Amino acid sequence: MRSGRSFAVLVSLLATFALPAACGSEPRDGFGHEGDGALAGDGGGVLDDDGEAPPGELRDPVTCAEAAAARSYVGCDYWATPGANIVQDVFDFTIAVANVGSEPATVDVTGAGDLRWQITVGPGSLGKVHLPWIAELKGNAITSVTTSAVAKGSAYHVVSDRPVVVYQFSPLQFRAQGGDPGKSWSGCRKQLGADDCYSYSNDASLLLPSTAMTGTYRIMGSYGFSRRPIDESTQKPDPTKEPLPGYAPYFLVTATRDGTVVNVNLGPKGQVAAGGGIPATAAGGVVTFTLDAGDIAQVVSGVGRDYDFSGSLLTADKPVQVITGVPCIDFPLDVIACDHIEETVFPAETLGKHYVVAMPSGPTDAKVGHVVRFYGNVDGTTLTYKPQRPAGCPATLSAGDVVECGEVGIDFEVEGDHAFGVGTFLLGASKVDPQFTLLKSMGDPSQSFAVTVAQYRQKYVFLAPTDYTVSYVDVIASEGTKLTLDGEDVSSSLAPIGGTDWFAARIKLAPVNDGAHTLLSSKPTGIQVLGYGSYTSYQYPGGLNLGEIAPAPVK
C-alpha cells in the first residue's frame, strides 16, 4: 500500500478541496537488472520417498509443472497490471521477481507491441524490471480517471522457465532516486517545502500465477475517496462541512486467454461509469464484456465514497486476474494523508472460514491500528470471535455483504461456518506516525487481504524493497512454532494474542539481499509484508497457498 501528498496534493492545497497529501518459453531479446541478492535457508522436515520435502511443505516447486500442481503464489506465468494512480509518471511501475530455486531462472516480460525485456535471476536472487505506465489506465497526477477503459494487449506477461514469485509496485520508489541506469529525475516536481521530490502515492500487490487463477471472484476492496474541505486556519478537514468527492474506486480484470467473457453482478453501490466499450450500468445491475489474452479492463465507478464495487460477484468463463484499487484515499475519513491503494483479489474458491487478524507494525516499530472490512460470500454465515468481537465488526454475513468495522485496535481471531473475506487498510500518517508533521512523516493508507489459516505455509520467499525507510514482516503462528528468518532464529519475537491459541510477531527487516528474504517455520504460518516512507506505505500478503477449499458462490 501508498501516499497522498503527490503533485495533486500541492495543487489541491491551493484549492478548496485539498489532498495533504508459461514455462519453458523461448528467450526474447531485452534488457533488465540481473538479481544479485541471496535468499537464506533451505527447507527440511517430512521427507518423501526421494528424500525431499514435498512442494508446499518446506520445499518450493522446482519445475513449472510442480508449481502448477501445487497451486500457491509460486509459479512460472504471471500478468502485471498497472492501474489508476495520481503519482507523477517519473516514478516507475516495477515488477520484482524472486527465484525460489537452486538454478538460474530466465524471465521474459512482454507488453503491447514490441515491448520486451529479459532478465536472468540467479538462485535465491531478486530481479527488478521497471515498466512503462499504461496511460489510459493510470490517468494524470491531478484528476485521475473518471471513466472505464479497456487497454488491448497491454498487460505485462511475465514468463519464467523456473518457479518464481512476483510482486508489482505502483510505483516502487518513494523518493526521486533509483530506476534504470542513467535515469533522469530532473522532471520530478518537488512539493512546497519538501527536502526532496517524493512520490507520496505508492502501493504494491502480490501477483498470483495464472495456474492458480479461477473465473470466480468476490470483489473485495474499498469505496472511493471523499474529504471535507480544508479549514484554512487549521489546515485540517473542516468537520462542519460535508465531504466532497475526490477519486473513484475501480477494479482491473486481466484476461489470460482469448475470448474470455466476463460478467459482474454489481453490488448495491457498484455503479459503472461507461468507457472503452464497457457500458454505463446502474448499481445492482449486470455488466458484461469480452477480453482477449493480455487485455485489461479497468472498470471505474462514480467519484467519491458513495461508490464501492465491494461485494459484487465476478464470473468469467476462463481464468482471469482481478485487482481492486483507488487512485488515492484517506483511512479513516479525513485523516491525512490520502494514498494509492491496490491489491490482488484472491479467487473466491480460495477464501476460508478462519482468520487471525493482527494489528500491523507501525513506522516506529510499535503496532498500530488499522481499518478492517468483512466481505460476505455465502448467505447465513455466522461469525465467532476471540478474545472478543471488535466494535463494529459483524456477527453474521450474507453473500455480497460488506461490513466495515472501522478502526480496529486489537488482535483477534474470527471463525465462520462458511467462507468469507477480510480486508485490512493501513491508516494515514497523522494516525500512525507519532512524529507527524505536515512536511515529513511516515505512513498513509495501503490495502491488503488477510490470509485464511487453511492457506498458511511453512516457507515464504518474499520481498521487502530496500527503497523504503523501514519494512516489516508480521507473522501469525500457532503455539510452539519455531521461526527462522534468513537463517536466524526469530522464534522469540512471537508473543501470545490474548484469549486465543495464536501468536503474533512483528519483525523489522534488515535492508539486506536487495530486500529478498526467506521465512521458514515448523508449523504453517501467515505473513504480511509492509513498509513505510515519507507520506507513503505498502502492504501485501507475503504469500499463501491457493488451494480451492470453498465452493464457488452462486450469488
What are these regions (language model features)?
Residues 4-6:
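Topology signature of small-to-medium multi-pass alpha-helical membrane proteins
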Residues 2, 18-58:
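Ser/Thr-rich, Pro/Gly/Ala-heavy low-complexity intrinsically disordered linkers and tails
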Residues 8-20:
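Bacterial N-terminal signal peptides
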Residues 51-555:
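Intrinsically disordered, low-complexity linker/terminal regions across diverse proteins
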